[in-house]
Amino acid sequence: LSKDTFIFELKQNGLVIQSGIFKTSVEPGTTKTMPVQFKQINTPGYYTKTIYYKTPLGIQSFDQQVFEVKQDQPKEQAMLVVEGKETIGIQFIDTEYLFDKRKGLVSIQVNDEEILKQAPKPVFYRALTDNDRGAKQTYANWLNASLFQNVVDFKMIRNSKCAQMIYTIQLESIEEECKLVYTVYNNQSIQIQLHLDKNSQRQTLPLFGIEFALKKEFKNFAYFGKGEKDTYIDRDHALTDFYFENVDTNYIPYLKPQEHGNHTDCKWCSLSNDTIQVNIKSEKMECMASKYSFMHLYNANHTFELPQTNTTHLRITKQQMGVGGINSWGAKVQPQYLIDQSKNLDFTCTLYISKKD
């Protein structure tokens, strides 16, 4: 190892705040411990501690720790809740949320500027990959469960700190229900919870999450997670960092359009236009942003068949099954990379709005 180099690096919110290089010599068949003194951290933010092992031919491997120093909650504001026959409006000084009792969160306005194109929906399906097709997996029940949803019950719970909207949604194709819960706090944030009861007898579940449809101007995508290339649960040997994409250019032109653009082990992501940033955070999630929905990709046989769109789609998931194909094409996803449906599925994330400088 005497010719090899170790590099250590500490990043805060994607910026290097400490780095260094050291070498060592280890006799064959022995081990040696080398202490690395990182700075004490107390400033809020997302951090990575990374050590790279580099030979004269280049970097060979790395090890990494990821952690967050949480910041204080935003200040509470006056929150006005107005309930009508079909809708519930929640108003702050410059932000307003509108919930339809049959459709969900149908509007987010900041200074009278609309952000959403459609209400967020639970999503359980992905555009089939070449490996899915090769393994003759269609997951048809989950396609229909993502497309055909019916709110069968709604209720609101209100207290001095928050207003909670609880939707019970019938998934016709699997004859089961899921729950989608929005909790609006008086700091303007929305906690979003998705729940599906356990059932190990179901068809393989491709993914479990929520898809948002925003106006196309929200095309600047950022995330803190594994990147910068696509990562999946069985393809996630990547560095955690802050990465940036533009949904106008992040499409991958496979011969047949298919699932792409996923990022694992994310803690935060955002979509922004010139003035407003929509943020979503979670302890652990997977995310992707695209100008195409999974149905756009699913329906097209060739890239030229994809439509011109006026929407940015953001998919946030607890987990997506792996992509499989360990024999290069057609092999089913290995069991350890499938979603475990023998346990209840619960996913929680928080949405909040910020203004760009």
Name what the model sees in each region.
Residues 1-98, 192:
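Carbohydrate-binding surfaces of carbohydrate-active enzymes
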Residues 74-357:
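Beta-strand/loop-rich accessory regions of lumenal/periplasmic or secreted enzymes
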